[in-house]
Amino acid sequence: QDGKAAAKPVLLAVSFGTSYNNNRNVSIGAIESALREAYPNYEVRRAFTSQIIIDVLDKRDGIDIDNVTEAMDRLVADGVKEVVVQPTHVIPGFEYDDVVKEVSKYNDKFDSLKIGRPLLVDDGDYTDLIGVLTKETARYNVAGTALVFMGHGTEHEANATYGKLQDCLLYTS
């Protein structure tokens, strides 16, 4: 014990990122705000997985955002002992796999290191999401109106998640 106060536990919100400033505030920023509210004993920090987005924001706007490695190194340097990494990914695809691989290198650097799951992993996740989507889009449930939900797709096997979600939505309609 060197007399320093223990660093507050950190919840690292990891997303692909976006170079659109307004969109970032209402999407990624909203998720981070919800995390702060839900976990007030944690400091919420941000990391992006897209180095291209990070570089654009730095060059264009002077905004400095860590990639996952930089964020993890900073947590070690700051003396943080407890870390929860929560990706904002929808499916467990390549981006999520990369986050898990990178973060796992730091297992021995913290007293506690946990990695959260993407939005859609098991059957209950689909049920929960469909419940939210149904409630939040109820006002559009009128004759002649169609709702289209889009995912970016991937060559990863997790792409099947989108088909499963579609099947679940059709089954519950």
Residue ranges and their predicted role:
Residues 11-15, 83-88, 146-150:
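Short, structured motif recognition centered on aromatic/hydrophobic residues
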Residues 72-124, 130, 134, 155:
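Hydrophobic, ordered structural segments
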Residues 136-166:
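Surface-exposed interaction/gating patches
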Residues 28-36:
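Short catalytic helix/loop segments, enriched in acidic residues and glycine
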Residues 1-10:
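N-terminal low-complexity, Pro/Thr/Ser-rich intrinsically disordered segments
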Residues 41-51:
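A short beta-strand-loop structural module common to alpha/beta enzyme folds
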Residues 61-74:
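Glycine-rich, highly charged phosphate/nucleotide-binding loops
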Residues 171-172:
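Conserved small/polar residues in nucleotide/adenosyl-binding loops
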